[in-house]
A protein has these predicted regions:
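Long, basic/Gly/Ser/Thr-rich N-terminal segments
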Residues: 1-16, 181-185, 189, 214, ...
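Catalytic cores of phosphodiester-bond-cleaving enzymes
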Residues: 17-25, 157-159, 165-169, 246
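Glycine-rich phosphate-binding P-loop
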Residues: 35-49
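Nucleotide-state-sensitive switch-loop elements of NTP-binding domains
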Residues: 23-34, 48, 57-121, 126-127
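Extreme N-terminal, non-catalytic leader segments
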Residues: 1-34, 100
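Conserved catalytic-core segment of NTP-binding enzymes
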Residues: 120-222
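NTP-binding/hydrolysis catalytic cores, primarily Walker-type P-loop NTPases
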Residues: 225-268
Length: 268
């Protein structure tokens, strides 16, 4: 996938059993998935697009919403039928716009994917907390999952801070961590994410994780860059795209890796 003009490609790795696993036998047909991270350009929209493609492939009724007032990345995928939610009014975030989103989440039976921009991270999360939105959704039979990205490289500390702020402010065990190594290994002082204080202090809030490990950029990377430039889903590229046999094979490998990790989270 593409992040800030760069190609992202990943090697398969089993989803880590972060969390105690007690909730994983539960099934939430009408689940809601928020892609949230206060740091921009770390793969947040990538996560949203993978989730949308995954639930479509698993036969779920999927509704996608793009709330990013700056970068409408998810909205550009025609096959995902993404709805735009306008939150900017006279240059400021209109929090009442979230009322419209909540109304939709509460009244429609579907699996929702909501891609939130970095600029609306604090307003949306504040709205959820101040309005006890999780309780409202739970009473309506909806399960909310919060997907957040931890990335290596220079943005490691910023993304850890975003994760920590989410974990400290939620009372639910509903955070799914996406460990994105595109910008570098996720390590600090020789410790992996699971050994860092940020995780240890909040592991009871983590439902599970998906590990995105970088692949060979000369093959998988170039193939994915072409798919993204055409704004195609992986299914579109594999079935009808103007690509070689081996390109389609590499796309299948990538798709299988991601989907199997999400399967292990038991989100269906």
């Amino acid at each position: 996938m593409s992040q800030n003009g760069a190609t992202v490609a990943y090697a398969p790795k089993e989803a880590m059993p972060i969390g105690d696993g007690k909730d994983k036998t539960e099934v939430f047909a009408n689940s809601i998935h928020l892609s949230l991270q206060g740091k921009g350009g770390v793969g947040k929209s990538l996560v949203a697009s993978i989730l949308a493609q995954y639930f479509n492939a698993r036969g779920k009724a999927v509704r996608c919403v793009d709330t990013d007032p700056v970068n409408r990345t998810l909205f550009q995928y025609k096959a995902l039928n993404v709805n735009r939610l306008e939150l900017l009014r006279e240059g400021s975030i209109d929090q009442r716009g979230f009322d419209s989103l909540m109304e939709t989440l509460l009244t429609e039976d579907a699996t929702f994917i909501v891609d939130n921009g970095a600029s609306t991270f604090i307003p949306l999360w504040s709205y959820i907390l101040e309005n006890s939105a999780v309780d409202v959704l739970t009473r309506a039979g909806k399960r909310l999952y919060v997907h957040t990205v931890i990335t290596g490289g220079q943005a490691l500390l910023d993304t850890l801070h975003g994760f920590k702020s989410l974990a400290e402010s939620t009372s639910e065990r509903n955070i799914i961590v996406w460990l994105n190594e595109y910008f570098g290994r996720i390590e600090r002082d020789g410790k992996s994410f699971e050994d860092m204080g940020a995780y240890r202090e909040s592991e009871n809030k983590v439902f599970g994780s998906v590990h995105l490990t970088k692949r060979n950029q000369d093959t998988f990377g170039r193939d994915l860059e072409e798919v993204i430039s055409r704004k195609l889903t992986l299914d579109e590229a594999i079935k009808d795209g103007p690509f070689s046999i081996m390109t389609k094979q590499r796309l299948k490998v990538m798709q299988r890796d991601w989907f199997e990790q999400i399967d292990s989270l038991t989100l269906l």
